[in-house]
């Protein structure tokens, strides 16, 4: 199991969650994403626009698109829809869709553990050009908008802590998204 660390971040304020929280990125075709952002200018999806959403003749350069994504992020943060968490935290999340429910932990994991092949196992072959685009996004926009999901073998101690926290604390956010997921 890799080391995990709490982190500080901007969290959407509860009253803005339905408008701001992005449906699953890969649930949309590029054309659907483009239409969605036009209809939902306050949605975080406007911060993670990609070149494949544009017709070839209308596509901006990658540099220009990333600058626009950064401007969209600054606009969202300036709008008062997010609050900064001063104290580094670990975050639990629970998603419920129909009969399916999943719970996870949002935390930081040192990149070194992944790069060294320790604890975090590579599960897919990634394309170098996409890795370079993601790095350019993080450097230009200044946000980690593509978290990596990790799983772990069942550990009763972890499950007990998660259960205790969920039973003893009210959720910071509790809403149903535009795609019906709570």
Which residue ranges define each predicted feature?
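A cross-family signal for N-terminal binding/gating loops and helix N-caps
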Residues: 1-182
């Amino acid at each position: 199991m890799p080391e995990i660390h709490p982190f500080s971040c901007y969290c959407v304020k509860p009253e803005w969650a339905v408008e701001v929280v992005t449906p699953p990125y890969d649930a949309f075709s590029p054309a659907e994403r483009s239409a969605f952002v036009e209809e939902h200018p306050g949605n975080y999806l406007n911060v993670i626009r990609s070149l494949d959403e544009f017709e070839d003749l209308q596509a901006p350069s990658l540099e220009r698109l990333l600058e626009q994504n950064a401007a969209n992020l600054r606009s969202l943060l300036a709008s008062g829809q997010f609050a900064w968490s001063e104290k580094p935290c670990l975050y639990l999340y629970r998603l419920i869709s129909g009969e399916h429910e999943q719970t996870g932990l949002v935390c930081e994991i040192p990149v070194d553990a992944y790069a060294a092949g320790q604890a975090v196992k590579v599960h897919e072959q990634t394309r170098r050009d996409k890795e370079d685009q993601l790095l350019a996004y993080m450097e230009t926009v200044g946000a980690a908008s593509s978290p990596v999901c990790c799983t772990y073998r069942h550990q009763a101690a972890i499950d007990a802590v998660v259960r205790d926290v969920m039973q003893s604390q009210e959720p910071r956010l509790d809403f149903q998204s535009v795609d019906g997921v709570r």
